[in-house]
From Swiss-Prot:
It comes from Escherichia coli (strain K12). InterPro entries: DUF2502. Keywords: Signal. Pfam families: DUF2502. This is Uncharacterized protein YpeC. To E.coli YaaX. Residues 1-21 form the signal peptide. The lineage of its organism: Bacteria, Pseudomonadati, Pseudomonadota, Gammaproteobacteria, Enterobacterales.
Length: 108
């Protein structure tokens, strides 16, 4: 008898903590609602109003979560142009590096 009363009291005490995924009541007068829509059909994501296709344009589902589109960098692609890549590598190969006190490549 005592166990069942204790269990019933515990269930009644923890009932307000349960909330559905769309709405969480923080205080009696404050509600947190993720996924609300305005009259144009835009979604509220917690910081900005986003249109319906925002997530599919800017994010992709990979490895069990949403990732921002990175234009193939996650596959190891280097999207810089070959000219820029060669220019930067050539700049690093210079012997003077135009450092302090070196002038214009002259060894003083």
């Amino acid at each position: 008898m005592f166990r069942s009363l204790f269990l019933a009291a515990a269930l009644m005490a923890f009932t307000p903590l349960a909330a559905n995924a769309g709405e969480i009541t923080l205080l009696p007068s404050i509600k947190l609602q993720i996924g609300d829509r305005d009259h144009y059909g835009n979604y509220w994501d917690g910081g900005h109003w986003r249109d319906r296709d925002y997530w599919h344009r800017n994010y992709e589902w990979r490895k069990n979560r949403w990732w921002r589109h990175d234009n193939g960098y996650h596959r190891g692609w280097d999207k810089r142009k070959a000219y820029e890549r060669g220019y930067r590598e050539g700049w690093r190969d210079r012997d003077d590096h135009r450092g302090k006190g070196r002038g214009h490549g002259h060894r003083h």
